Amino acid sequence: KEELRAASASYTAQEFNLLNDLNNLTINGRKLEEHEKRIIIDKVKTSNTINMRKIIADVMGEKIEEFYGARIDKSEKEIFHKMEVYNKMRKALAEIHVNIEEFSRENLDEIGYILTINTDKEAMMEAFEHANVKLSEEIKDCLISLRKTNGALFSKWHSFSLKIMKELIPEMYQQPKEQMTLLTEMGVMRGQMDKFEKNKYIPVDAADEDIFNPVVRRAVRISFKILNALMK
């Protein structure tokens, strides 16, 4: 499962995305230090309202004079990943007197996966029965209710697997580098290129293995087979 694309709702994917946002920033002429990134992420995980500029300024202990590198939306407004699924889950669990910090990274990753790959209550309950993480009926009902009212947050898959993100995250804390730079330096991108560089044709099975929608997968396979036929 760690080799598959991760659920965007997994804890690891949320931390990875926020770290990538932070590493893209240059503030007052410098990059964020490791300890600053850790404190910022802790604040994002525990705040009820999140103002990223304010959190960053408070952690840096500086007034922000220059701020570059943030992603922007169509209205030119800065946007950041804010661990939205984690925070909604934290608040929902708190209502039934459960502390989200009782769950490990692996627990939260598995919960995120189950709530993403399944869409109906029966399937989710069955998945929880077979999961490594053991939950009470009250917690299961809480999580399923959260998923029902926030379906869009549990409908996406990340570009990377849990395995790759877990390898990158320690480096992303230590170095002010974004994901693609680190992937190239660590040889992950090169490894993917080497994997197929001797292929004369598109390896259909390998190329579509991360596509989960069966209709889309079939369309992609047909397209690749046509391209391969044209290259013969």
Task: Describe each region flagged by the PLM.
Residues 1-232:
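Long, compositionally biased intrinsically disordered regions
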